[in-house]
Curated annotation (Swiss-Prot):
Name assigned to this protein: Ribosomal protein uS12 methylthiotransferase RimO
Record function comment: Catalyzes the methylthiolation of an aspartic acid residue of ribosomal protein uS12.
Alphabetical UniProt keywords: 4Fe-4S, Cytoplasm, Iron, Iron-sulfur, Metal-binding, S-adenosyl-L-methionine, Transferase
Species per Swiss-Prot/TrEMBL record: Nitrosomonas europaea (strain ATCC 19718 / CIP 103999 / KCTC 2705 / NBRC 14298)
SUPFAM superfamilies listed in its UniProt record: Radical SAM enzymes
A molecular-function term among this protein's GO annotations: protein methylthiotransferase activity
Annotated ranges, domain Radical SAM core: 142-379
Length: 447
């Protein structure tokens, strides 16, 4: 028999939270903020449903397929665990979630870290003795150690007729420039070698606060994308810009790319090539001006890689207007293109437009566009054969090395394949010579 004085006292079980993150990089950043708060308060993060005391699902609600995936994931978490808190863009439509899954514990909208934490506290009280030293200065990240997403603002002031993001994430709210730059510095100090700058509307940064001057390391910096980009360019790592709306002042960023302060890469959603369709979308409608600007950008920075997204089968789109889009692609010679068929997402103003395009025609046009663009992308990549490029290594194993060049954003663009070499590590910058090219990817040898 063991005496009371010698009995082993079992420490209390540390509460564990499971986490599922769906959607775009902006949602990933929201997830990282919640995870950072959880670790700061002493919670453990469970990799499985079975070991978790409850599960948080960060949802996406941008298009119908994303809604379906989110609802399916919530259902899976309820089946496997039973205690689920829902957040994210689909959370802005609580009635949709409650109708499908009435037993969820709580529902919040996007960028709702405090509300999520309050819901977790209600259903899973936090530990009494959190360990703040478990949280590094850069916070908890879901990306590999060598790259990270840096969100500079929330929301959007535009009212594009195909989009419901403003109804879910609200109007533009820019972060203080000093906070953005300090987070960037913390990430660099932690070993990050590439920052992917994201928001709903990156080029609008600072509009809501009238480009107010902030401070970083004792010097004044305006809350404006050009000034922010210039300061980020001083960190000595790759800076990649995403979700750049084609405002005129975007032209100011191209010289920074030519100078090497920013990666010569621009993710800029043009959406279509027809003036009438662009007007129906409530997007900038002067495609001739866009093409002239692209030529000017390439004159200033010949290596610039341009990525864009397009919608086919928008309500009222005629065959002639679709062919105008193909002609725009031919003239623009974009490096990377993503496209999808218009989907009548509930709440989008475009749903009220006349003459919806039948699904079979949408899919036929989408296939034609992607085939058309594949030839353009293939030709542009072929021009890189024999060139020496600096690449950032993502993975290394017995099958070889997978890296990315300045023209390749993670997960959405192509990659550079290098022969097996275990002297190379993830996060290394390596100079390579391009030996073969494809439609999306490159093959290379280390030099």
């Amino acid at each position: 028999m063991t005496s009371a004085s010698s009995a082993t006292i079992q420490p209390p079980r540390i509460p564990r939270v499971g986490f599922v993150s769906l959607g775009c990089p902006k949602a990933t950043v929201d997830s990282e903020r919640i995870l950072t708060c959880l670790r700061a308060e002493g919670y453990l993060i469970s990799p499985s449903y079975a070991d978790a005391d409850l599960v948080v699902v960060n949802t996406c609600g941008f298009i119908d397929s994303a809604v379906a995936e989110s609802l399916e994931t919530i259902g899976e978490a309820l089946t496997e665990n039973g205690k689920v808190i829902v957040t994210g863009c689909l959370g802005a439509k609580e009635d949709v979630i409650r109708q499908a899954h009435p037993s969820v514990l709580a529902v919040t909208g996007p960028q709702a870290t405090e509300e999520v934490m309050q819901a977790i506290h209600r259903h899973l009280p936090k530990p009494h003795d959190p360990y703040l030293d478990l949280v590094p200065p850069q916070g908890i990240k879901l990306t590999p150690k060598h790259y990270a997403y840096l969100k500079i603002s929330e929301g959007c002031n535009h009212r594009c007729t195909f989009c419901i993001i403003p109804s879910m994430r609200g109007d533009l709210v820019s972060r203080p420039v000093g906070n953005v730059l300090q987070e960037a510095q913390n990430l660099v100090d932690a070993g990050v070698r590439e920052l992917l700058i994201i928001s709903q509307d990156t080029s609008a940064y600072g509009v809501d606060i009238k480009y107010r001057t902030g401070f970083w390391q004792g010097r004044p910096i305006r809350s404006r994308i050009t000034e922010l980009a210039r300061a980020l360019g001083e960190l000595g790592i790759w800076i990649r810009l995403h979700y750049v709306y084609p405002y005129p002042h975007v032209d100011e960023l191209i010289p920074l790319m030519a100078e090497g302060k920013l990666l010569p890469y621009l993710d800029i959603p043009f959406q279509h090539g027809s003036k009438r369709i662009l007007k129906l979308m409530k997007r900038p409608a002067n495609s001739e001006n866009v093409l002239a600007r692209i030529r000017q950008w390439r004159d200033i920075c010949p290596d610039i890689a341009l990525r864009s997204t397009f919608i086919v089968g928008f309500p009222g789109e005629t065959e002639q207007e679709f062919e105008e889009l193909l002609a725009f692609l031919e003239e623009a010679q974009l490096d990377r293109v993503g496209a999808f068929a218009y989907s009548p997402v509930k709440g989008a103003a475009a749903n009220a437009l006349p003459d919806p395009v039948p699904s079979e025609i949408q899919q036929e046009r989408l296939a034609r566009l992607m085939q058309w663009q594949e030839e353009i992308s293939k030709k542009r990549l072929a021009g890189k054969k024999g060139r020496i490029l600096k690449v950032l290594v993502d993975t290394v194993d017995e099958n070889g090395v997978i890296a990315r060049s300045y023209a390749d954003a993670p997960e959405i663009d192509g990659v550079v394949y290098i022969e097996p070499d275990f002297s190379i590590k993830p996060g290394d910058w390596v100079d390579v010579r391009i030996t073969r090219t494809g439609i999306h990817d490159l093959w290379a040898k280390k030099i």
